[in-house]
Regions:
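Long luminal/extracellular ectodomains of secretory-pathway precursor proteins
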Residues: 1-544
Length: 544
């Protein structure tokens, strides 16, 4: 009788606590697994972050975790482990969950990292030690596929090297040139060494030949270097050499060779040792309160010493930029100002309405478009400074409204690269801004079964690709069965599709987008209007 009264009393207290608004709690359980092998991952760090607090623990030998007494409501589970990647190959995997009476166990899948090991072999008995090896990865940046450096290692005493912690993708390896360390006399016309080598071997650094690494894959490569004669190359430089002088020599695959500056009585120039082949010498100078200087010189080495009369280093002049606003509604002018120092005095001016990012079409390096008011010009007159000659993709970012068009002469920079000649020669850049933006109301199509409490909500990643020449592309925006409103979209016709995982698209390459032809929907966004979209999730194709 007493036991029954105590049980009734205990139940009554819990019922009374729930009636009085005390929080309900539930256990959150799950497993962390390898996304490739589906095996459990032990000692993965799992964190649960709720509305007011967070807690962490390591998984057991079966990859399991359990957080007791978690308050009902929304929270996020995060998992990480050295040697693995999470969402979009970041360090953590994040999963939003809803804690409630119907909560189920969760599975967190981490992607294993790949590894490249290799061996450098040289002729005869040389072990190939202390050779610099550069790892390049094919990255996507602003819709462009670019080969960019990832890491550098030196071979050990046996000529071996290792690159670990690699995310899936395409890679290449290159070695630096090396020359025998003996010091030649002034009249020596040849030295021996090893020119750069690449793996896989190819003639074009942007060709398709690459080393593909899948999740968790371990690859071993062998690279053989060939002993080759190097010949002295001298390039005379006209004009005064400034303290901020630099020079490099590149072969046809954009691999750099060392070059040194020499200063003699009435002569100055570059000195280098190169094997037979075709090259380009790039010379740059930087001085305070002066525009940068630039020059390039093509070289051909044919099994003999070379002496070239180098080019004159020309100052890089600014490019005129016109920004015209065709706004149909008032804008909020915050009155922000930029303060800079010019010739020892303070200059105050409003910020530009557009930020420009220039991406080299040859090596993928970024340069910020330093816009400043054109002296004596009106509010629409600007200058793009300190951009060296070359070919660049231009990505504009409007601070208000959107970029309706961006051109340079007859070149549409939303479609084609900007070409800057010697001395910064380029047609003026014309930018038109508008603010009659559209809004997209979007949600996923669902069967309705996934909306029950405790179940993970379906989600996808929305991509909007303009079917007209535009610098605007929306990608990797998470959407769910709940309506999301996406404002500030330039009006026009778009190809809309939602993928089951987030990935960057090579959207400037029509061939890379062929896999998504016929998937998703074609929608039209009207100026100042709202477009409603219900869309299905489609599988993401393998990385291009």
């Amino acid at each position: 009788m007493l036991c029954g009264m105590l049980l009734f009393f205990s139940y009554g207290l819990r019922f009374q606590a729930q009636e009085n608004g005390a929080p309900r709690t539930y256990d959150v359980r799950g497993t962390v697994i390898n996304s490739t092998t589906h095996e459990p991952i032990a000692r993965a760090l799992v964190t649960i972050a709720g509305q007011e607090s967070s807690s962490s623990q390591l998984t057991d030998n079966e990859g399991r975790f359990e957080f007791p007494n978690v308050r009902a409501g929304g929270c996020t589970l995060q998992a990480r482990r050295p040697g693995f990647f999470g969402s979009n190959f970041s360090r953590d995997l994040s999963l939003p969950v809803e804690v409630g009476p119907d909560i189920h166990e969760h599975t967190l899948a981490l992607t294993p990292a790949g590894t490249i090991t290799g061996q450098i072999t040289l002729p005869a008995s040389d072990p190939g030690g202390n050779i610099r090896v550069q790892l390049m990865r094919r990255n996507l940046q602003e819709g462009l596929a670019l080969w960019q450096p990832v890491a550098m290692k030196m071979t050990n005493s046996e000529g071996a090297f290792r690159f670990g912690g690699l995310q899936p993708g395409e890679y290449k390896l290159t070695t630096d040139s090396t020359i025998d360390p003996d010091v030649p006399s002034a009249r020596v016309s040849v030295r021996w060494g090893f020119p750069p080598a690449s793996y896989p071997e190819e003639g074009d650094s942007n060709a398709s030949g690459a080393l593909k690494i899948n999740p968790g894959q371990q690859v071993n490569v062998q690279m053989a270097l060939t002993r080759t004669p190097f010949y002295p190359v001298t390039i005379s430089i006209a004009g005064k050499v400034t303290p901020g002088f630099s020079a490099q020599i590149f072969d046809g695959m954009s691999r750099a060779y060392a070059a040194t500056l020499f200063l003699r009585a009435q002569q100055q120039g570059l000195y280098a040792w190169l094997p037979a082949g075709n090259y380009t010498a790039i010379i740059q100078s930087f001085s305070p309160n002066m525009p940068p200087g630039y020059a390039s010189e093509p070289l051909t080495v044919r099994d003999a010493p070379v002496h070239a009369d180098g080019p004159v280093i020309l100052p890089v002049h600014p490019i005129s930029v016109s920004i015209r606003k065709e706004f149909t509604s008032p804008v909020n002018n915050s009155g922000a100002q930029i303060v800079r120092i010019e010739n020892g005095r303070q200059v105050i001016e409003p910020p530009a309405d557009v930020n420009l990012v220039l991406i080299s079409a040859t090596d993928g390096n970024n340069t910020g478009g330093n816009l400043r008011h054109e002296p004596g010009g009106d509010d629409s007159s600007w200058q793009l400074e300190n951009v060296l000659p070359g070919k660049y993709w231009v990505q504009p970012y409007a601070n208000q409204g959107y970029v309706a068009s961006i051109t340079a002469g007859g070149t549409d920079l939303a479609r084609d690269p900007l070409v800057i000649g010697p001395g910064g020669a380029s047609a003026p850049i014309d930018i038109v801004l508008r603010n009659d933006t559209a809004t997209l109301s979007v949600r996923l199509k669902t069967t309705g079964s996934a909306s029950e409490a405790g179940e993970d909500q379906p989600h996808g990643y929305l991509y909007l690709l303009p079917q007209f020449d535009s610098s605007f592309v929306m990608q990797r925006v998470m959407i769910s069965a709940q309506i999301s409103y996406l404002p500030n979209i330039p009006p026009g016709t778009y190809h809309a599709f939602a993928l089951d995982r987030e990935m960057d698209l090579e959207y400037r390459n029509p061939k890379a987008l062929e896999a998504y032809t016929g998937k998703g929907q074609i929608i039209t966004m009207e100026p100042n209007g709202t477009t409603n979209l219900q869309i299905d999730v489609v599988p993401a194709e393998a990385e291009q």
